[in-house]
Amino acid sequence: MAASVSHPALSSFHKISCNITGISGLISFSRRISVSSVLPTSAVAAKRDAAGKGVRGQMKPRRQAGEPRTERMAVDQDWTAVYPTAASFKPSAVPLPVRMGYPVNRGVPPAKHGNLELIKIPNFLHLTPATIKKHCEALKPFLTEWPSALDSDEKCTEHFPIQVQSKDFVSSGLSLRNPDARIVTLKVKHSSLNLDDHARKKMIKLAEKRYCKETDTLTITTDSCPLRQQNYDYAMYLLTVLYHESWKSEAWEQEKTRADMEEYEWQDSPSQRNILETLKSIRGTEETHELLDQPEVGEYRNSVTQMKNHGETEENLLRYKEAVKKLLQL
């Protein structure tokens, strides 16, 4: 009975203590809010930073910039160590008074320090003569000696008549690709090809404007393919096709007469037969090959061929006149 009477009293006492604790917590929280509202924001931030950093929060003194590298470079230094590979222009590493840009107020162009014009353009500071020599020395163990028989350009052209030309470009734009880099030009001396008279004339006819008569050179330019190697293969293919097609003889080609020829040929022509008959009647009995080997006959042959192929000009007529006088001993 006593226990049942004391239980309500204990519960009411517990409620009173809880209320007192909650009121004291609210009072302390309100005091913190009032103090923080009174202090300025900068003071609170400074106090927080000082508490977080402590000794480490102190700023270190700024380092002074040293002298540029160009002032410490030796005269006989290894330049390949300064610019070992391709790189942009570095004013602190190039000991040259380089200037570039538009001069302001009729002055001199801007100096190299802070000059964007020098940084934008490509340079060849990594390809000095000393660097190229070092590269050549490093590649020597992997190369063979130049053939001793090819000691002149004439011999090189004789043994290697085909010349292939292409171009490489250095660009400072957004793309490294240049459409002209894929173009391949193949040149070959027409006389160096193994052709007879029929094949030689037919190849000239098939090549059309690709053949230059003054230099006797056949030029094939290919730019249809997107890659240089493809254009090279296509140029070699065209040369092979021209060579083999020139050797083919069609049925209609056998019906060509002397009047259908592209050029005048003195061999077996009426002019040759007439001059041989005239010389035989004047000088007596002589062999045909002996008469053809004489220099006077050769000069007459050249003058007639020149006049037939290039027209009857004053120079050609005078040359023909002198050849006839020498031939007939007039």
From Swiss-Prot:
Disulfide bonds: none annotated. It is found in: Mitochondrion. GO terms for biological process: mitochondrial translation. InterPro entries: Ribosomal_mS35_mit, Ribosomal_mS35_mt. Component of the mitochondrial ribosome small subunit (28S) which comprises a 12S rRNA and about 30 distinct proteins. PANTHER family: MITOCHONDRIAL 28S RIBOSOMAL PROTEIN S28, SMALL RIBOSOMAL SUBUNIT PROTEIN MS35. This is Small ribosomal subunit protein mS35. It comes from Danio rerio.
